[in-house]
Amino acid sequence: MKSAIHPDYHTIKVVMTDGTEYTTRSTWGKEGDTMNLDIDPTTHPAWTGGQQTLLDRGGRLSKFKKRFEGFGL
């Protein structure tokens, strides 16, 4: 395996939407960083089997709906 071509693999803390925290190894961020999830397996409709409404984080969903409201799909 070639050296110095792979990203740094380190420990981070992941915080799920319900506040549950766990530690994992990742290439995301830096050692000791915290990743706060907007959606996770406990809230995503694909894993819960429900038709939950997704939270509009940062206005993206509202912007999309406003942009395409006249199409009548």
From Swiss-Prot:
Highest taxon of the lineage: Bacteria
GO cellular component assignments: ribonucleoprotein complex; ribosome
Keywords from the named record: Ribonucleoprotein, Ribosomal protein, RNA-binding, rRNA-binding
Gene Ontology process terms (BP): translation
InterPro entries named among the record's database cross-references: Ribosomal_bL28/bL31-like_sf, Ribosomal_bL31, Ribosomal_bL31_A, Ribosomal_bL31_sf
GO MF: rRNA binding; structural constituent of ribosome
The UniProt record lists the keyword Iron-sulfur: no
Family affiliation: Belongs to the bacterial ribosomal protein bL31 family. Type A subfamily.
Subunit structure: Part of the 50S ribosomal subunit.
Function, as annotated: Binds the 23S rRNA.
Name this polypeptide is given: Large ribosomal subunit protein bL31
